[in-house]
């Protein structure tokens, strides 16, 4: 039996972070965590691109274009959608996730979902460097591992 598992040091890989500008205080912290994690794991600064989009709704179309171009081994999607008084939150969060899944299934380029879907801004703060860690950093770790794993699979 052969066991496959990714590690955190894919050689020569380029990464792109696609991040929404909405809730910038939160998303800036997520981007910082992701960048720090990539660099801490041997990815050079010049092998990381950051693309800012208006909101989470726009992440899938940009991820799709980037995946088709093929310059990046993985796409790290970051954003923050906060529940409001209407169902808009559900549509944005759900369809953003579906769009990202569609991109990775159609292109074979991993699209890691670090888009927070939270009840309130306090929940987001806890996940952007607070008591629940930094989900941007965690998403970057998953990207590193997936790139390595996909390189190893037959």
Swiss-Prot record:
UniProt-annotated catalytic positions: 88
Molecular function via GO: 6,7-dimethyl-8-ribityllumazine synthase activity
EC class (word): transferase
Recorded GO CC terms: cytosol; riboflavin synthase complex
HAMAP family, sorted: Lumazine_synth
Keyword terms, alphabetized: Riboflavin biosynthesis, Transferase
Role, per record: Catalyzes the formation of 6,7-dimethyl-8-ribityllumazine by condensation of 5-amino-6-(D-ribitylamino)uracil with 3,4-dihydroxy-2-butanone 4-phosphate. This is the penultimate step in the biosynthesis of riboflavin.
Taxonomic lineage of the native organism: Bacteria, Pseudomonadati, Pseudomonadota, Gammaproteobacteria, Lysobacterales
Pfam families linked: DMRL_synthase
Protein residues bound to 5-amino-6-(D-ribitylamino)uracil: 22, 56-58, 80-82, 113
Binding site for (2S)-2-hydroxy-3-oxobutyl phosphate: 85-86, 127
InterPro entries, per database record: LS, LS/RS, LS/RS_sf
Name the record gives this protein: 6,7-dimethyl-8-ribityllumazine synthase
Enzyme Commission number(s) from the entry: 2.5.1.78
The keyword Cytoplasm is annotated on this UniProt entry: no
